[in-house]
Structure formats: C-alpha cells, structure tokens
C-alpha cells in the first residue's frame, strides 16, 4: 500500500535537467498553463488552429508543386506560382508568430460568467545563460475598457527547483496565483 502511494507521487513529480534551460522553461510554462486554467480561464486555441491551417495549406502547396503531372519545362509557370504562394504563405505565418504570439505560452477566454474582464495572454521569458524567469500576464484585448494593466514576475528559477531538478510546485503555484490575483486587482473597476 505504501509503495503505491510513492509510485503515484513520483509520477506527478515534474523533473527538469538543470543544465538545459529549454527543459526548465518547458516545465515552468506547462505548470503556468495548468495553474491559469485551474483558475477558471479556458484556453483559446484559435490562433493555434489558424497556424495549423496555414501550415497545412503550405504543405499542400509544396506537395502539389512536387507531384504535378507535367515535367519541368512544361510546368514552369505553375511551379513559379507555387513557389510564390509558398513564400507568401510562410511570410504570413511568420508575421502572425512575430506580431500576435511573441513569447506567449497561453491565450485564454474570459472566465465564464464574467462581463468585466478580458481573456489573458500569458507570456514567459528565460534568456539563455540566465536563471531569471519572467512571467507576464496581459489582457487578451488591450483596447477593451475592461483590460487590466500588465503584471510581471521575475524570479530566479533556483527558488522553484531542488538541486535534483524537481519542481517545488507549491512555491511556484503560490507565486503564479499571486500574480494572477495581482492582475485581477489591476483590472479597472466599474463606475457606479
């Protein structure tokens, strides 16, 4: 009985390679997503779906160009059109990544039943050769009347991981929830 408890506890442990900052960032980002969604915010996957659709169209264009019935000299104009379309669609995809996504790890809808808040854009940064993890919460609709001010948390990742690379979820959870609460307090209050 005791062994089963230990096994189930070990399965839920999030462990990172402390020498790999990508591994650390991935575990922290995954935990942030879990925390935010547990607070009643549902994930908005529209941007991800748009990127997938664009990527699929790009692949279809490349496949059509590759396996078109006619051989090269005869299909020259068609190939030029496919190449141009491929470049344009990739440029659109990169533009979306650069302007909309940036460092975002999670887009959310407003909490259900809430008429006074917008969804969230949660973004994070862990620069190379640095231990400073920056977590930012912004409004998904910054032009909205009910958009809150951006809040930010910057801390050393060494405060959340043991020397074995295990994430101390309680400490991290507390810091992220405090940031979410801080954002909720920053939201503009309705005038009566």
Swiss-Prot record:
Residues 1-46, 99-192 are cytoplasmic. Pfam families: SPC25 (PF06703). This is Signal peptidase complex subunit 2. One of its GO terms (cellular component) is signal peptidase complex. Component of the signal peptidase complex (SPC) composed of a catalytic subunit SEC11 and three accessory subunits SPCS1, SPCS2 and SPCS3. The complex induces a local thinning of the ER membrane which is used to measure the length of the signal peptide (SP) h-region of protein substrates. This ensures the selectivity of the complex towards h-regions shorter than 18-20 amino acids. Component of the signal peptidase complex (SPC) which catalyzes the cleavage of N-terminal signal sequences from nascent proteins as they are translocated into the lumen of the endoplasmic reticulum. Enhances the enzymatic activity of SPC and facilitates the interactions between different components of the translocation site. Residues 70-78 are lumenal. It is a multi-pass membrane protein. InterPro entries: Spc2/SPCS2 (IPR009582). Its main location: endoplasmic reticulum. Keywords: Endoplasmic reticulum, Membrane, Transmembrane, Transmembrane helix. The chain crosses the membrane at residues 47-69, 79-98. It is found in: Endoplasmic reticulum membrane. GO terms for biological process: signal peptide processing. Belongs to the SPCS2 family.
């Amino acid at each position: 009985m005791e062994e089963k408890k230990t096994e189930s506890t070990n399965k839920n442990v999030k462990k990172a390679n402390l020498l790999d900052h990508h591994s650390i960032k991935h575990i922290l980002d995954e935990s942030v997503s879990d925390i935010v969604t547990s607070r009643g915010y549902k994930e908005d996957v529209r941007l991800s779906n748009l990127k997938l659709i664009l990527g699929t169209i790009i692949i279809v264009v490349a496949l059509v160009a590759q396996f078109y019935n006619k051989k090269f000299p005869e299909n020259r104009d068609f190939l030029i059109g496919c190449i141009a379309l491929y470049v344009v669609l990739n440029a659109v995809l990169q533009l979306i990544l650069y302007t909309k996504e940036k460092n975002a790890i999670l887009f959310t809808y407003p909490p259900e039943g809430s008429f006074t808040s917008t969804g969230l854009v949660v973004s994070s940064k862990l620069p190379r050769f640095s231990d400073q993890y920056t977590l930012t919460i912004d409004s998904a609709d910054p032009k909205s009347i009910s958009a809150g001010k951006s809040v930010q948390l910057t801390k050393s990742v060494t405060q959340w991981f043991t020397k074995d690379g295990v994430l101390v979820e309680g400490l991290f959870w507390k810091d992220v929830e405090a940031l979410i609460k801080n954002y909720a307090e920053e939201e503009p209050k309705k005038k009566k």
